[in-house]
Structures are given as C-alpha cells and as structure tokens.
Regions:
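Short amphipathic alpha-helix adjacent to the substrate-entry channel of hydrolases
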Residues: 83-103
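Short beta-to-alpha linker loops that shape the active-site pocket of alpha/beta-hydrolase fold enzymes
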Residues: 76, 105-109
Length: 112
C-alpha cells in the first residue's frame, strides 16, 4: 500500500510539473557582449518588458507532444517586448495542438 501511494504521488507530481512552463536562463553566467544596460528589467505596462538584461527561454510542454516545436520572439516596435499578446497568450493553443511552445525574452540594443 505504501509503495502504491508513493507511485501515485510521484505520477501526480510529474503530471503537474509537465504542464507548468519552465523558464531557462540563456546565459546563467552572464551574457556575452553585454549590451551595456544595467539595472532591473522594467515592465512599463502589463507584460511589456524593457531593459532586458537577463534573457530567458520559457518552455511550455504539451500533454501529448507531436514532435514539433516553435520559438516565439515577441515584438514591440523596437521599444520593448510584448510578452503577452505576442508570447505567453498563444501557449495554450499551440500546446493543445501537441506543439512544444517556447517564448524567447531577448536583449535589444542600448536604450530599448
């Protein structure tokens, strides 16, 4: 009985983690060729990010993967990154199709 309970807890934990997005730093030890930006990221309006100093890749794994994947690079008129409408909001649709979906939060040149 104890072993069965342990297996059930492990499966439930694995399933719950499989549906959570995973945020991976692109350069854990710091980005090469720094853009010169310092300070914290700024969210100037909901999910519109500027001053990206720590780029990341957020991965959404579908429940039933079909072997395909897409990397979304949100735009924002060269002022920042629209992380919702051009990024995170589309994850449920792609994952529903079995496609692994990734959102890239990338650096931009100084002042952007």
């Amino acid at each position: 009985m104890r072993r069965l309970l342990s297996i059930i807890v492990s499966l439930v934990t694995a399933i719950s983690f499989a549906q959570q997005p995973v945020e991976l730093p692109l350069w854990p030890d710091g980005a090469p060729n720094s853009s010169g930006l310092t300070g914290e990221e700024q969210e100037t309006r909901p999910h519109f990010v500027t001053n990206v100093t720590h780029p990341t890749l957020t991965v959404y794994h579908p429940e039933k993967p079909n072997g395909m994947a897409i990397i979304m690079c949100p735009g924002g008129g060269y002022r920042g990154l629209g992380m919702d409408g051009e990024g995170y909001d589309m994850a449920p649709w792609f994952c529903g199709q079995g496609i692994t979906y990734m959102v890239l939060k990338y650096r931009m040149p100084n002042g952007h």
